[in-house]
């Protein structure tokens, strides 16, 4: 039996390093950053949720359900994940950031295969050198664990998943897959990369 997989695109941060600009809505080669992300993951999942804590009306224009953190105060990616986990009845939830326009087109099948091979609860993507803590495939049933972790004052995603049976799936064959945009300079470099 095939697994049902939904996705959440995290666009709920404050983007301090981008001068406060909403990263998902910043244009890259004529399209909003989040549109590049949507195009990469849409063929791989059933439903997409967008986690946003500002500009919700603009995000809704992309045609997907927009959800805001149930824990207020910009508490980081865990808050967005918790909210999304409560909004899906899928077997797995794919978590990706809004500012990774080169995500692998085989992200879900490889991460799902890694989970099943190890009978794990979570798959974490890696670029071959570093884990990508906000590129995850996980079971929504882990929501209570994540919620307790956040409510205890913790914020680091990797500290949370280290408490569970997780597997790392390397995408070293796609070294630019997880390049993201945190500064205007990175945006300029990435725009050049995409046009190559």
From Swiss-Prot:
It catalyses: Mo-molybdopterin + GTP + H(+) = Mo-molybdopterin guanine dinucleotide + diphosphate. GO terms for biological process: bis(molybdopterin guanine dinucleotide)molybdenum biosynthetic process. InterPro entries: MobA-like_NTP_Trfase, Molybde_CF_guanTrfase, Nucleotide-diphossugar_trans. The keyword Coiled coil does not apply. Keywords: Cytoplasm, GTP-binding, Magnesium, Metal-binding, Molybdenum cofactor biosynthesis, Nucleotide-binding, Transferase. PANTHER family: MOLYBDENUM COFACTOR GUANYLYLTRANSFERASE. This is Molybdenum cofactor guanylyltransferase. It comes from Shewanella baltica (strain OS155 / ATCC BAA-1091).
């Amino acid at each position: 039996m095939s697994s049902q997989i939904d996705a959440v695109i995290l666009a709920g941060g404050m983007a301090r390093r981008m001068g406060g600009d909403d990263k998902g809505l910043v244009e890259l080669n004529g399209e909003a950053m989040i549109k590049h992300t949507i195009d990469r993951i849409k063929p791989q999942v059933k439903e997409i949720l967008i986690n946003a804590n500002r500009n919700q009306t603009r995000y809704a224009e992309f045609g997907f359900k927009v959800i805001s953190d149930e824990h207020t105060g910009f508490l980081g990616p865990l808050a967005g994940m918790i909210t999304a986990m409560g909004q899906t009845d899928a077997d797995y939830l794919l978590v990706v950031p809004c500012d990774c326009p080169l995500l692998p087109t085989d992200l879900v099948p490889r991460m799902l295969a890694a989970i099943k091979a190890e009978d794990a609860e979570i798959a974490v993507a890696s670029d071959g050198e570093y884990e990508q803590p906000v590129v995850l495939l996980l079971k929504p049933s882990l929501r209570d664990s994540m919620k307790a972790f956040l409510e205890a004052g913790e914020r680091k995603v990797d500290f949370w998943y280290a408490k569970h049976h997780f597997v790392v799936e390397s995408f070293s064959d796609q070294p630019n897959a997880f390049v993201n945009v945190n500064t205007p300079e990175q945006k300029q470099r990435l725009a050049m990369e995409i046009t190559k």
